[in-house]
UniProtKB/Swiss-Prot annotation:
Binding positions for Zn(2+) 2 per the UniProt entry: C65, H203, H207, H213
Disulphides: C279-C466
Residues that bind Zn(2+) 1: H152, D154, H167, H180
Biological role stated in the UniProt entry: May be involved in the modification of the extracellular matrix during metamorphic apoptosis.
Name this polypeptide is given: Stromelysin-3
UniProt entry tagged with the keyword Signal: yes
Gene Ontology biological process terms in this record: collagen catabolic process; extracellular matrix organization; proteolysis
A cellular component term, taken from the record's GO annotations: extracellular matrix
Record's signal peptide: 1-17
Family, per entry: Belongs to the peptidase M10A family.
Organism: Xenopus laevis (African clawed frog)
Residue numbers binding Ca(2+): D159, G160, G162, I164
Lineage, uppermost ranks: Eukaryota, Metazoa, Chordata, Craniata, Vertebrata
Keywords from the UniProt entry: Calcium, Cleavage on pair of basic residues, Collagen degradation, Disulfide bond, Extracellular matrix, Hydrolase, Metal-binding, Metalloprotease, Protease, Repeat, Secreted, Signal, Zinc, Zymogen
Length: 477
């Protein structure tokens, strides 16, 4: 049986001096203060992984959530001190379809980016439960998200930059669903220069749904704030939230009749303010990375493995590559596992540990253009070459020297049947090349060295099993 503990409604995520946050909370919840040595002994016992994070004076260095850590009791049936890992707050939502509203936004980030990140943080929990989250802009909502300052009406003031980052209230309390972020923090997305909004929000939403802290060091619900990418739930997080709400409901499949495509006009249906729909949009870039196919659009990425879209996608690309630009023009993986991203007149390189270098100007590679529209690696295993495309021209590129083989471009007409102005290109396991433009793609035969008969096809149907809209079907006739 899992332990249910009735705790105060508050979770506070602190940025710097955890002892101050801890003492502050003790005062707020009117608990008897502990001596420092007792607090350290307690946490070393129940959170052994943090011993190395204490300095010589026994002070806490890592940022952490300020709620006192209440461990599960010993397992009396076994006679051993076997701990229950996740802990529940004592409450849960009585419904699974929840609405949320964002009242105010941080000054450093656009509303579009904040909305996108909040939706992504909620999706971390909805993809493993039956929960759904819908943003509303008017009227009442179940969840209130606010970026506010100092004293703001709940007797739990923020303290300006640093210190307290955010707090949330548990279900079945007088302020259930309230999640507050300190407006004055240096909020960022996808990097550790400031405070990463995605990771803080996902942690706070776990409390808002009813989870307390976990004693697992790599758990999202660990009290210690760690900048970690890609963001994902640990098994402990998943067990805890599914104990409250159950597993996700299986999707209901729907028939997807195929539409034959002979000729399709280039269409664009960018949805910048919301999560893009793969069935209705074009793509900024497509690339084969680590044997999987990634589609990029407006800061989001779809991940296909073995031709199947993976659960939890689309997701923010920054969950995989911290520091990636919001939009990607082209991407490819080189022979040693580095991943290259191009946007505008710059490029970034992520090494095998996903550490980024850059941005660098495109002129560094030996060409005087302001954008690369597509890039891919093509050829046999022993004779792979990297190609960069822009408009009606292309270059062969050497990632080892970071230079093009010749600053003089070649004509895309060398790739018989491939249109000018492609948006992306990639190669499959059989050696066939794919060229993407708008919502269509052309399959290129490596043996006949030309586009195969019957192309272009629709990306949405062949890769995402979408049914074409009647408007789009009529445009094909």
């Amino acid at each position: 049986m899992h332990l249910l503990i009735l705790l105060p409604a508050l979770c506070v995520l602190g940025a710097h001096s955890a002892p101050l946050s801890y003492t502050y909370l003790q005062h707020r919840i009117q608990e008897k203060p502990q001596k420092d040595h007792g607090r350290l002994q307690f946490n070393s016992l129940h959170y052994p992984h943090i011993k190395g994070l204490l300095n010589a004076h026994g002070s806490w260095n890592p940022p952490r959530c300020g709620v006192p850590d209440i461990p599960a009791p010993p397992d009396s049936s076994s006679g051993r001190n076997r701990q229950k890992r996740f802990v529940l707050s004592g409450g849960r939502w009585d419904k699974t379809n929840l609405t949320y509203k964002i009242i105010r936004f941080p000054w450093q980030l656009s509303k579009v980016k904040v909305r996108r990140t909040i939706a992504e943080a909620l999706k971390v929990w909805s993809e493993v439960t039956p929960l759904t989250f819908t943003e509303v802009h008017e009227g009442r909502s179940d969840i209130i998200i606010d970026f506010t300052r100092y004293w703001h009406g709940d007797n739990l003031p923020f303290d300006g930059p640093g210190g307290i980052l955010a707090h949330a209230f548990f279900p079945k309390t007088h302020r259930e669903g309230d999640v507050h972020f300190d407006y004055d923090e240096a909020w960022t997305i996808g990097n550790n220069i400031g405070t990463d909004l995605l990771q803080v929000a996902a942690h706070e939403f776990g409390h808002m749904l009813g989870l307390q802290h976990s004693s697992i060091s790599k758990s999202l619900m660990s009290p210690f704030y760690t900048f970690r990418y890609p963001l994902s739930l640990s098994a402990d997080d998943k067990h805890g939230i599914q104990f409250l709400y159950g597993a996700p409901r299986p999707p209901t499949p729907s028939p997807t009749p195929r539409v034959e495509v002979n000729q399709v006009e280039n269409e664009s249906n960018e949805i910048p303010a919301a999560e893009p729909d793969a069935c209705k949009t074009n793509f900024d870039a497509v690339s084969t990375i680590r044997g999987e196919l990634f589609f990029f659009k407006s800061g989001y990425v779809w991940r296909l493995r073995g031709g199947k879209l993976q659960n939890g996608y689309p997701a923010l690309a920054s969950r995989h590559w911290r520091g990636i630009p919001d939009t990607v023009d082209a991407a490819f993986e080189d022979s040693v596992g580095n991943i290259w991203f191009f946007y505008g007149s710059q490029f970034w390189v992520f090494d095998g540990k996903l550490q980024a270098s850059g941005p660098f100007p495109i002129t560094d590679i030996g060409i005087s253009v302001t954008q690369i529209q597509a890039a891919f690696v093509w050829g046999t295993e022993k004779n792979k070459k990297t190609y960069l495309f822009r408009g009606g021209e292309y270059w062969r590129f050497n990632p080892e020297t970071r230079r093009v083989e010749s600053r003089h471009s070649r004509r895309i007409g060398d790739w018989r049947g491939v249109p000018k102005g492609i948006d992306a290109a990639f190669q499959d396991e059989q050696g066939y090349a794919y060229f993407v433009k708008g919502r269509q793609y052309w399959k290129f035969d490596p043996f006949k060295v030309r586009v195969m008969d019957g192309y272009p096809h629709l990306i949405s149907q062949d890769f995402f099993n979408c049914q074409a809209s009647s408007t789009f079907v009529n445009s094909l006739r």
